């Protein structure tokens, strides 16, 4: 069993979520100003070098908007911090990834891009299905202020 298997809340809700994501036909599409603006706003709020709008499918997280990770458009789901974030309704903040037992041996922490900090807010549809995240990343440990976390949640 991999990390991905441990974070899926239930097979039926995950199947419903994946079906809705496919129906939206947004994964693997071209950049759009709206999503780029969401990532830029998240970056400005948090003051981080990296901001993403991430969509999580069955095998990967794919970035609809990407600031700070040039040349990369996805990562395997089993490495995705966002796969954890979509399990809840609130912002997930990881203040020091190497010290967090969920992520200390994650290749995104131990290798490039060297994630130390992550905060992500789930993108939740009106019916409660979570499609992905608006997230920010830094290569240094830190903490956002409550108002910044709330603003990130509102963006999502």
Each language-model region and where it sits:
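Amphipathic alpha-helical regulatory segments at dimerization interfaces
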Residues: 24, 36-45, 84-88, 109
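Amphipathic alpha-helical "output/dimerization" segments
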Residues: 144-156
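Glycine-rich acetyl-CoA-binding "A-motif" of GNAT/NAT acetyltransferases
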Residues: 130
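Signal-transmission linkers at sensory-effector interfaces
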Residues: 1-33
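Helix-loop-beta substructure at the N-terminus of cytosolic sensory domains
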Residues: 28-61
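Regulatory sensory and allosteric helical modules in signal-transduction proteins
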Residues: 20, 49-50, 56, 60-64, ...
């Amino acid at each position: 069993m991999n990390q991905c298997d441990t974070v899926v809340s239930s097979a039926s809700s995950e199947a419903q979520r994946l079906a809705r994501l496919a129906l939206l036909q947004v994964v693997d599409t071209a950049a759009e100003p709206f999503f780029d603006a969401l990532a830029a706003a998240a970056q400005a709020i948090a003051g981080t070098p990296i901001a993403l709008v991430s969509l999580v499918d069955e095998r990967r997280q794919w970035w609809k908007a990407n600031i700070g990770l040039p040349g990369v458009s996805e990562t395997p789901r089993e490495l995705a911090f966002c796969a954890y974030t979509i399990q809840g309704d609130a912002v997930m903040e990881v203040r020091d990834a190497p010290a967090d037992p969920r992520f200390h041996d994650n290749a995104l922490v131990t290798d490039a891009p060297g994630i130390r900090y992550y905060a992500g807010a789930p993108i939740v549809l009106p019916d409660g299905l979570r499609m992905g995240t608006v997230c920010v990343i830094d290569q240094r440990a830190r903490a956002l202020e409550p108002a910044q976390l709330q603003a990130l949640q509102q963006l999502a």
